[in-house]
Amino acid sequence: MSGEDEQQEQTIAEDLVVTKYKMGGDIANRVLRSLVEASSSGVSVLSLCEKGDAMIMEETGKIFKKEKEMKKGIAFPTSISVNNCVCHFSPLKSDQDYILKEGDLVKIDLGVHVDGFIANVAHTFVVDVAQGTQVTGRKADVIKAAHLCAEAALRLVKPGNQNTQVTEAWNKVAHSFNCTPIEGMLSHQLKQHVIDGEKTIIQNPTDQQKKDHEKAEFEVHEVYAVDVLVSSGEGKAKDAGQRTTIYKRDPSKQYGLKMKTSRAFFSEVERRFDAMPFTLRAFEDEKKARMGVVECAKHELLQPFNVLYEKEGEFVAQFKFTVLLMPNGPMRITSGPFEPDLYKSEMEVQDAELKALLQSSASRKTQKKKKKKASKTAENATSGETLEENEAGD
């Protein structure tokens, strides 16, 4: 294989790439479900984060075993953010842990990659809801709002549509539940080994962000991690001084590190994680990792994923799914075990256009018989997907 061929970007136009995405998605969904089941009152968040990451490594270790050079594993470390914590809470052993309690609103966020093809997922639920009862009040409002935002996006992120259409729909859905999307949060296009591709969808932009944010059109064979974060409050996420534990390398930055600890740490980051987000928990010597990261972050070799908070007493819900824009419609490869009947809100979407959108089918068109004959490869690439779509859309 010549160097030129290697440089050529692989997309979901190739069957094998679709397969890798689906395998990663399948693992992400299984790990997520297992963590949701393990989340009950008295369980430590640290233990769940460790369990999630260990499961991802174990499951990705079972596939493509013959491909010794293939990188696979964690594309986003397991983060469990509770109540008013917005995102990226993934404590180290040396940090203060959080113990789940009944009634906590929990967001689990994680990512898996197979050969650099990324499947991200996030899901929100309430801990220990008694059988036969429903979640009501602001928790129900915010979870319903975020879930419907995700459902709207599944129907809007498709070739020919603009990113601004999604942003507008999110504002309308959230506001109908008297909630607000978290200001300035981005959903990114995904490419091989790249979790933050150039096309993005912005949530609830400020006037300045509206001016700066690039309008983009979705195109066939693109992949997106659609990330919805909705707050019962004002939607402003702030850093409250909680230690950052998740970072990723910025391949565009160069700097000659001065400290030996930093150099050793950074070379391990490059070797083990490339440009994927990672947690300092993954290092054998956590103390050295905490020291080594400082100089790397200061000179922007590493980008931090800061732990953010909404105001105390508010609730933030998150749903994230990964979608492949196939020629015959969007294919969602990740989703959580959402149970709509558990959440009872006094509010609902009023906008007629949005209502119609949410009621429209999100399953993909199955290809006509003639087409199938003409393109056996297309059939192979899309076989069995409508079933998954229906499951994901439940």
Curated annotation (Swiss-Prot):
What's noted about post-translational modification? Phosphorylated on serine and threonine residues. Phosphorylation is enhanced by HRG treatment. Basal phosphorylation is PKC-dependent and HRG-induced phosphorylation is predominantly PKC-independent. Phosphorylation at Ser-361 by PKC/PRKCD regulates its nucleolar localization. In cancer cells, isoform 2 is polyubiquitinated leading to its proteasomal degradation and phosphorylation by PKC/PRKCD enhances polyubiquitination.
Recorded family membership: Belongs to the peptidase M24 family.
Please give the tissue specificity annotation from the record for this chain. Isoform 2 is undetectable whereas isoform 1 is strongly expressed in cancer cells (at protein level). Isoform 1 and isoform 2 are widely expressed, including heart, brain, lung, pancreas, skeletal muscle, kidney, placenta and liver.
The family database entries (Pfam families) matched by this protein are listed as:
Peptidase_M24
> Which segments carry the region annotation Interaction with RNA?
361-375
Q: Its Gene Ontology biological processes?
A: negative regulation of apoptotic process; negative regulation of DNA-templated transcription; positive regulation of cell differentiation; regulation of translation; rRNA processing
Q: Which residues carry this modification: N-acetylserine?
A: S2
Q: Name the InterPro entries for this protein.
A: Creatinase/aminopeptidase-like (IPR036005), PA2G4 (IPR004545), PA2G4/ARX1 (IPR047113), Pept_M24 (IPR000994), Pept_M24A_MAP2_BS (IPR018349), WH-like_DNA-bd_sf (IPR036388), WH_DNA-bd_sf (IPR036390)
**Domain of life the protein comes from:** Eukaryota
Residues recorded with modification Phosphoserine:
S2, S335, S361
| Known outcome of mutating S361A | Loss of phosphorylation and interaction with ERBB3 and HUWE1
Q: Which keywords does this Swiss-Prot/TrEMBL entry list?
A: Acetylation, Cytoplasm, Isopeptide bond, Nucleus, Phosphoprotein, Repressor, Ribonucleoprotein, RNA-binding, rRNA processing, Transcription, Transcription regulation, Translation regulation, Ubl conjugation
For whether the record's keyword set contains Cell division, the answer is no
- Gene Ontology molecular function: any one: nucleic acid binding
Q: What does this protein do?
A: May play a role in a ERBB3-regulated signal transduction pathway. Seems be involved in growth regulation. Acts a corepressor of the androgen receptor (AR) and is regulated by the ERBB3 ligand neuregulin-1/heregulin (HRG). Inhibits transcription of some E2F1-regulated promoters, probably by recruiting histone acetylase (HAT) activity. Binds RNA. Associates with 28S, 18S and 5.8S mature rRNAs, several rRNA precursors and probably U3 small nucleolar RNA. May be involved in regulation of intermediate and late steps of rRNA processing. May be involved in ribosome assembly.
Is Hydrolase found in the keyword set?
Answer: no
Q: Where are the Phosphothreonine modifications?
A: T366, T386
Its organism's taxonomic lineage begins at: Eukaryota, Metazoa, Chordata, Craniata, Vertebrata
Subunit structure and binding partners: Isoform 2 interacts with the cytoplasmic domain of non-phosphorylated ERBB3; the interaction requires PKC activity. Interacts with AR. Treatment with HRG leads to dissociation from ERBB3 and increases association with AR. Interacts with NCL/nucleolin. Component of a ribonucleoprotein complex containing at least PA2G4, NCL, TOP1, PABPC2, RPLP0, acetylated histone H1 (HIST1H1A or H1F1), histone H1 2/4, RPL4, RPL8, RPL15, RPL18, RPL18A, RPL21, RPL11, RPL12, RPL28, RPL27, RPLP2 and RPL24. Interacts with HDAC2. Interacts with RB1; the interaction is enhanced upon PA2G4 dephosphorylation.
Basic residues bias: start-end ranges: 365-375
Region Necessary for nucleolar localization: what ranges?
Answer: 2-48, 301-394
Recorded protein name is Proliferation-associated protein 2G4
- Region: RNA-binding; residue ranges are 46-54
